[in-house]
């Protein structure tokens, strides 16, 4: 979990912005979005295959 210490003269808004940025860089939001709903293993494999195909096509 991301942790941000609030300085003495720091506003809550700037601390919240730093926390959001830290979570974004750590991939917390993407991970939560990925686990939002259950995904069958067959669907995971299909998505992975499609992503590889898209990557290969772009090169």
Swiss-Prot record:
From which domain of life does this come?
A: Bacteria
Q: Which Pfam families match?
A: Ribosomal_S21
Please give the InterPro entries that the UniProt record associates with this protein. Answer: Ribosomal_bS21, Ribosomal_bS21_CS, Ribosomal_bS21_sf
Sorted alphabetically, which Gene3D superfamilies does this protein's record hold? Answer: Ribosomal protein S8
Which intervals carry biased composition (Basic residues)?
A: 43-59
One BP annotation, GO: translation
Q: Which GO terms describe its cellular component?
A: ribonucleoprotein complex; ribosome
Q: Which UniProt keywords apply?
A: Ribonucleoprotein, Ribosomal protein
Chain intervals for the UniProt region annotation (Disordered): 34-59
Q: Which GO terms describe its molecular function?
A: structural constituent of ribosome
According to its UniProt record, which protein family does this protein belong to? Answer: Belongs to the bacterial ribosomal protein bS21 family.
Entry protein name: Small ribosomal subunit protein bS21
Source species of the chain: Desulforudis audaxviator (strain MP104C)
């Amino acid at each position: 979990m991301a942790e941000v210490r609030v300085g003495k003269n720091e506003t809550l808004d700037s601390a919240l912005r730093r926390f959001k940025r830290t979570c974004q860089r750590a991939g917390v939001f993407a991970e939560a979005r990925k686990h939002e709903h259950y995904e069958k293993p067959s669907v995971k494999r299909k998505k992975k295959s499609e992503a590889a195909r898209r990557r290969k096509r772009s090169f």
